[in-house]
UniProtKB/Swiss-Prot annotation:
Transmembrane segments: 1-21
Annotated region (Disordered), positions in chain: 192-220
Protein name according to UniProt: Sec-independent protein translocase protein TatB
Principal subcellular localisation of the protein: membrane
Keywords of this entry: Cell inner membrane, Cell membrane, Membrane, Protein transport, Translocation, Transmembrane, Transmembrane helix, Transport
Job description of the protein: Part of the twin-arginine translocation (Tat) system that transports large folded proteins containing a characteristic twin-arginine motif in their signal peptide across membranes. Together with TatC, TatB is part of a receptor directly interacting with Tat signal peptides. TatB may form an oligomeric binding site that transiently accommodates folded Tat precursor proteins before their translocation.
InterPro entries: TatB
Top-level taxon of the source organism: Bacteria
Subunit structure: The Tat system comprises two distinct complexes: a TatABC complex, containing multiple copies of TatA, TatB and TatC subunits, and a separate TatA complex, containing only TatA subunits. Substrates initially bind to the TatABC complex, which probably triggers association of the separate TatA complex to form the active translocon.
Length: 220
């Protein structure tokens, strides 16, 4: 390692024996030999690491050369397919950029059209449709209002017995009925005098005798 010959080594031992003496010379020799071993091991590890790195570099270079040679030796069909794929990718990129540019926000140069003149003739507004639906529902509302008023009047009349109800129906059929508008019924409230007259008619009907019902078999 250090290129020391036998004569030089013998000279070093003689100098060490004179300087250190026979007692400390063996200890000095052992320490020096240990240092030499460590230095040799370090040198060996460094050499191994350098050799491995050189081998890896050579392998990488060889792989690159093989790849380049394989690309150069490709068949024309593979080259054409690769070119088509590249062109398709570029076309997709261009179409995406065009779509993104066309979808511009509503700015001063591209305002939102809200004027009635800009609406097409075939488009109809939504307000007439709502008005037609409201007019279609108006008769149903009027019928419901009249039914509720009639029910309230019928519930307000006192019912004593089944006979009075039957006689009341006969009386109602015999008397003429006048048409009353929904507005008149809603506007005119029922007074106390009218309630008293209804009560008096009910008591008169209950006090009267039972009506005779003619059947085909004879009188009852």
């Amino acid at each position: 390692m250090f290129d020391i010959g036998f004569s030089e080594l013998l000279l070093v031992l003689v100098i060490g024996l004179v300087v250190l003496g026979p007692e400390r010379l063996p200890v000095a020799v052992r320490t020096v030999s240990g240092w030499i071993r460590t230095l040799r091991s370090l040198a060996a590890t460094v050499q191994n690491e350098l050799a491995q790195e050189l081998k890896l570099q050579e392998l990488q270079d060889s792989l690159k050369k093989v790849e380049q040679a394989g690309l150069q030796n490709l068949t024309p069909e593979l080259k054409a397919s690769m070119d088509e794929l590249k062109e398709a990718a570029e076309a997709l990129k261009r179409s995406y950029h065009v779509d993104a540019g066309s979808e511009a926000p509503h700015t001063i140069h591209n305002p939102l059209v809200t004027e009635p003149e800009a609406i097409h003739d075939g488009v109809t507004p939504a307000e007439p449709a709502t008005q037609v639906s409201a007019l279609a529902q108006a008769p149903n509302i009027l019928e419901a209002g009249t039914a509720s008023v009639v029910d309230s009047v019928v519930e307000a009349a006192p019912v004593t017995t089944v006979k009075s109800v039957v006689q009341g129906e006969v009386l109602v059929k015999s008397t003429p009925v006048q048409e009353v508008g929904l507005a008149d019924v809603m506007d005119k409230p029922v007074t106390k005098q009218q309630i008293d007259t209804i009560d008096s008619h009910g008591t008169d009907l209950s006090s009267a005798g039972p009506s005779r019902i003619h059947q085909p078999g004879g009188d009852q």
